Amino acid sequence: MISQILMIFTLISIWLSLAWGLVILISAVQFWLKHSDFRVDTSPLLYYPKVTIVVPAHNEDVVIAQTAKAILDMNYPHDRVELLLFADNCSDRTYEECLAVKALPEYAGRDVTIIDRTGTGGKAGVLNDALKMATGDYICVYDADAMPEKNALYFLVKEVLKDPERHVASFGRNKTRNANQNFLTRCINQEIVVTQRVHHVGMWNLFKIGRIPGTNFI
């Protein structure tokens, strides 16, 4: 008797999950059809608020230099960007890699601060420390293995400035950095793309619920 009840419960759960997934998919399709005429606009903003970009890094010496360079090369006024690079309890060369990037001639005069952190709390601890140090109007967070596109920060700020009294956060889509490296990375990238472009979009279209990721947001 108990096994039969469990079987029925399992079947109902599976069908409900499939039905809910179908609802989200239809909602996402509706959203994309509604915005099919969207065109990218990169016209200059009337105002560029200062943004403090925080990058928590724990033993990321393989990728941190590329990430820091990508951030410093973004299409946003250089004097309106403060970059805080946290080498959080690192046992590798993350801190030295950050120093090397800051010393490059093309980044001379840029507002870059490198912190060799020994505190506790991991990423949450880093963000709490950064909050006390930040001098920008907004705080933007990127993971150490992120490589933001040129206009990433521009679009985040632009979205918030549409209604700064109501829009307290803005986030962008992410994709796998090395998506085409092998079968596993392609699968990971596909999972991220489906989650962000179907599930997140469907939830937003239905309930105006957005889920802020851990990177690429202000």
Give, region by region, the residue ranges found by the protein language model.
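The conserved acidic donor/metal-binding loop of glycosyltransferases
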Residues: 143-147
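Long helical/loop segments within the catalytic core of UDP-sugar-dependent glycosyltransferases
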Residues: 30, 102, 106-109, 116-132, ...
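Short, acidic, metal-binding catalytic loop of nucleotide-sugar glycosyltransferases
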Residues: 69-80
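Short aromatic/hydrophobic "clamp" motif used to bind/position activated sugar donors
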Residues: 139
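Acidic helix N-cap motif at the loop->helix transition within catalytic regions
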Residues: 65, 92-101, 151
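A conserved acidic beta->alpha catalytic loop
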Residues: 78, 87-96, 119-120
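N-terminal membrane-anchoring/stem segments of glycan-assembly enzymes
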Residues: 1-47
